[in-house]
C-alpha cells in the first residue's frame, strides 16, 4: 500500500466509514437489549447514516456513470423497450416525482440498507457485530446497483423463509427482485436449493472442497463455454451478454482479482468449524451458515469473472452476517467454545476494521468522490 497516494477524498471516505461504524455500534447497543424488534424504525440511525454515506457518492464506481444515461433515457421515454418492467416502473415514478439520477442513487441505498435491517431485526441479541459487518461489507453493491436493488427484495423474502419456512412470501418478493434484474434468477434458484438442506454442512468436507478449489480448479472450463453461450437463442434481452460471452466467461480478458491470502484461508477454516458449532447449538442459523459456506467455497472461482462475482457477492454477505453472530455468541457463551476462540474474536475484530474501514478507504487508484466533488459534471466520464 502506497501511503503517498492518499488524497483528501480517501481521508474523507475513511472518516465517513468510521462514522458509519460508530453510529451502527451505538444503534445496536440499544437494540440488542431487547428480545425482539417489532419496528424497523428502531434502526433509523443505521438506515439514515448508510443512506447518506452510500447515496451521496458521485461518479463511482463505473456503473454510476453508465446508469446516469440509462436512467435519463427511461425517464425521457427513449430507453430500450425490453428493460426489466419493475425497474422501469420505479425509474418512471421517480422521474415523474422530479427525482434526478442522484436522488435515485440515494433511494437505492435506502432500500438496500432497509432490507438488510429488516432481515436482521429478528436477531437483536446478535446484532452487535453482524449489523456493522453487514453495513461495511456492501461496498460492491455500489458497483452493481441494480443487481442489489433487486436483491433487496429477495433478502426481505428470505427473512420469511429463514424464520417461518414461508416459501410463498419468498417467491413473491423474489419475483419483485427478478423483475428489477433478470440475472437474479440464478441467485433465487441457488437460495431455494441451499435452504432445502436441513443440516449444517460438514466443516471438514467443506474445508477439503475449498482447498481443492484453491489448488486444482482451472478457469479454462468457463472459456470453453463462451462459444456455446454465444450460439444459444435466448431472446434479444440477453443479446448483448451473448455477444460479449467471451469477455464474461474468459478470465484472461478480465482483471483477475481472485487471490486468496493466508489470513482469508485461516478465517474460512475458523468460520467453517466455528459456524458449525454455532449451528449445532442454534439451528436457526443453519440456512444462513450453509449459504455462507457455499459462497466461501465458490469465492476463489467467482473472483476471476465479473459475472460470477455478481452472483456470489449476494451470497457472500452471509459470511459477514454469520461471522458476526458467531463472534457475538463466543462472547456470550465462552464455556461452549475452545478457549482460544475468545482470543480470535479480538483478532478478527481488528482485521475487519482494517479490511472494511481502513483498506477500503485507502486502496491504490481509488478516488472516493461525493456530490460536492462534481463541479457541475453529471458523470465522471467513461
Tell where the protein language model's regions lie, with residue ranges.
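Membrane-interface alpha helices of multi-pass inner-membrane proteins
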Residues: 137-139, 169-193, 296-300
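Hydrophobic/aromatic-rich transmembrane helices and adjacent perimembrane loops
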Residues: 309-326
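Signature aromatic-anchored transmembrane alpha helix within multi-pass, membrane-resident enzymes
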Residues: 207-212, 332-354
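Short acidic/glycine- and proline-prone juxtamembrane loop motifs at membrane-interface regions
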Residues: 142-149
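Transmembrane-helix signature of polytopic, membrane-embedded enzymes
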Residues: 117-135
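Membrane-interface transmembrane helices that cradle and orient dolichyl/undecaprenyl
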Residues: 154-168
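TM-lumen/periplasm interface segments of multi-pass membrane proteins
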Residues: 1-9, 13, 31-108, 355-382
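Alpha-helical transmembrane segments and terminal signal-anchor/GPI-anchor hydrophobic tails
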Residues: 41, 60, 65-69, 74, ...
Amino acid at each position: 500500500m502506497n501511503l503517498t497516494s492518499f488524497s483528501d477524498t480517501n481521508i474523507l471516505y475513511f472518516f465517513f466509514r468510521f462514522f458509519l461504524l460508530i453510529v451502527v455500534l451505538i444503534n445496536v447497543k440499544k437494540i440488542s437489549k431487547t428480545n425482539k424488534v417489532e419496528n424497523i424504525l428502531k434502526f433509523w440511525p443505521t438506515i439514515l447514516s448508510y443512506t447518506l454515506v452510500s447515496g451521496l457518492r458521485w461518479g463511482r464506481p463505473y456503473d454510476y456513470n453508465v446508469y446516469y444515461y440509462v436512467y435519463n433515457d427511461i425517464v425521457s421515454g427513449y430507453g430500450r423497450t425490453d428493460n426489466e418492467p419493475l425497474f422501469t416502473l420505479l425509474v418512471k415514478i421517480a422521474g415523474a416525482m422530479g427525482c434526478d439520477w442522484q436522488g435515485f442513487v440515494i433511494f437505492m441505498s435506502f432500500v438496500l440498507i432497509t432490507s438488510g435491517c429488516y432481515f436482521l431485526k429478528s436477531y437483536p441479541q446478535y446484532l452487535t457485530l453482524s449489523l456493522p459487518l453487514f453495513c461495511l461489507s456492501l461496498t460492491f453493491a455500489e458497483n452493481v446497483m441494480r443487481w442489489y436493488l433487486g436483491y433487496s427484495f429477495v433478502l426481505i423474502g428470505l427473512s420469511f423463509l429463514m424464520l417461518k419456512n414461508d416459501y410463498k412470501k419468498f417467491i413473491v418478493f423474489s419475483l419483485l427482485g427478478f423483475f428489477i434484474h433478470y440475472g437474479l434468477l440464478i441467485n433465487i434458484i441457488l437460495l431455494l436449493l441451499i435452504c432445502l438442506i436441513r443440516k449444517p454442512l460438514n466443516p471438514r468436507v467443506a474445508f477439503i472442497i475449498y482447498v481443492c478449489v484453491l489448488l486444482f480448479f482451472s478457469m479454462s472450463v468457463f472459456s470453453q463455454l463462451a462459444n456455446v453461450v454465444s450460439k444459444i437463442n435466448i431472446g434479444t434481452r440477453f443479446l448483448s451478454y451473448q455477444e460479449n460471452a467471451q469477455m464474461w466467461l474468459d478470465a484472461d480478458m478480465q482483471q483477475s482479482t481472485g487471490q486468496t491470502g493466508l489470513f482469508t484461508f485461516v478465517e474460512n477454516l475458523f468460520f467453517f468449524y466455528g459456524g458449525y458449532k454455532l449451528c449445532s447449538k442454534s439451528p436457526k442459523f443453519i440456512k444462513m451458515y450453509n449459504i455462507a459456506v457455499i459462497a466461501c467455497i465458490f469465492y476463489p472461482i467467482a473472483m476471476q469473472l465479473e459475472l460470477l462475482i455478481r452472483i456470489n457477492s449476494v451470497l457472500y454477505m452471509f459470511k459477514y452476517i454469520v461471522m458476526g453472530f458467531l463472534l457475538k455468541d463466543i462472547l456470550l457463551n465462552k464455556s461452549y467454545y475452545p478457549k482460544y476462540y475468545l482470543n480470535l474474536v479480538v483478532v478478527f475484530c481488528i482485521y475487519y476494521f482494517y479490511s472494511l474501514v481502513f483498506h477500503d478507504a485507502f486502496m491504490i487508484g481509488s478516488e472516493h468522490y461525493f456530490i460536492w466533488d462534481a463541479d457541475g459534471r453529471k458523470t465522471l466520464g467513461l
